[in-house]
Amino acid sequence: MKEYFDMNEKQDLQQLYEFNAEKHLFDSITPCKYSAQIDATAKHKDRQFAVEIKHRLMPKDKYKTIMIEDYKYLELMLEYQFTGREPLYINFLNDAVVIFNLNKLKSKPKQKVLDIQSNGYDKLQKLERRYYLDINDAVIYDWKWKTQQYS
């Protein structure tokens, strides 16, 4: 199980590095420790960011919303409250990168409770809440990861 999460975290960060090398959004990116709720911190000029990364096997036009787990949303917002790092939720899709600055949402996220099959825990998992972010609140870059794909 730990290997599954380790591999995903490494691939998430690799995607972020490659995307940033092409788009130059950040001056620096620093990974957070393993199993932290936040994947990385980043800087651009005088701005600092807390970054959560997610990879989704879907095209950008499949849904009008993208979900975030409630604990990740709350952790990013607490990070902003206590450190001033702007909360970014970065989603790598099949054909695009969708970036939400959670401080700049124009519409309140909807909440849902749902059951999912967890690949990491290999069982049906009950989640208390997920927030659904309106894709219109995001900045979207057309981009495709060139070097590797998730399995």
Give the location of each predicted region.
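Conserved catalytic cores of phosphodiester-cleaving nucleases, focusing on short active-site segments
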Residues: A40-P59
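Catalytic cores of nucleic-acid endonucleases
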Residues: K2-F5, K54-K104
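Short beta-strand or tight-loop elements
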Residues: A36-I38
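Acidic-basic catalytic patches of nuclease active cores, encompassing PD-(D/E)XK
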Residues: M1-Y34
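Short, conserved, surface-exposed binding loops centered on an aromatic residue
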Residues: P31-C32, T41-K43, E79-Q81
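Non-catalytic C-terminal interaction segments of nucleic acid-processing enzymes
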Residues: K23-H24, S28, Y34, K45, ...
